[in-house]
């Protein structure tokens, strides 16, 4: 398997999702589809979901919703983080994006991967250090978790609602 980019031009719009999925099936790494616009990217994404719902992701540009300015809804941020993690970990997935979205600044791959920490049963955890690390990464310490990006430490029990997962 050769590494590098594959660029296809001259395809009809209706051929793009089918050809992309055909290429994706043959590769053991992520496939990145860059569309001319967010509108085209969303259309290709929706069509690719016909072929594979669980292996296709959409990475769009940041949209500003003025009625959400004060809300602490981090679901869009979480979706982007999950997509970036899949790319960084080289998971087999199709990421559909636009030129505008791909030109945005994202967290460097090394920084992203260096800030992932995993614990298993039996590990001894320094709660103060864990708390500081989570706050440094943008998590909010709360008494009761209600949303993404929050964590709670009560009586030696740690609850984290990671942006990487859909459930706490």
What does each model-identified segment do?
Residues 1-168:
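ASCE RecA-like P-loop NTPase motor cores
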């Amino acid at each position: 398997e050769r590494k590098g980019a594959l660029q296809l031009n001259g395809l009809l719009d209706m051929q793009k999702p089918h050809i992309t999925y055909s290429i994706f099936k043959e590769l053991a790494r992520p496939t990145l589809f860059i569309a001319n616009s967010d509108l085209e990217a969303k259309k290709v994404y929706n069509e690719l979901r016909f072929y594979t719902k669980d292996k296709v992701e959409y990475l769009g540009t940041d949209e500003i919703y003025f009625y959400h300015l004060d809300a602490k809804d981090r679901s869009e941020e979480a979706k982007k983080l999950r997509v970036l993690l899949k790319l960084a970990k080289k998971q087999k997935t199709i990421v559909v994006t636009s030129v505008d979205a791909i030109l945005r600044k994202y967290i460097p791959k090394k920084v992203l991967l260096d800030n992932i920490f995993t614990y298993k049963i039996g590990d001894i955890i320094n709660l103060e250090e864990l708390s500081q690390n989570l706050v440094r990464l943008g998590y909010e310490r709360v008494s009761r978790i209600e949303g993404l990006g929050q964590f709670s430490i009560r009586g030696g029990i740690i609850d984290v609602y990671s942006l990487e997962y859909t459930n706490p």
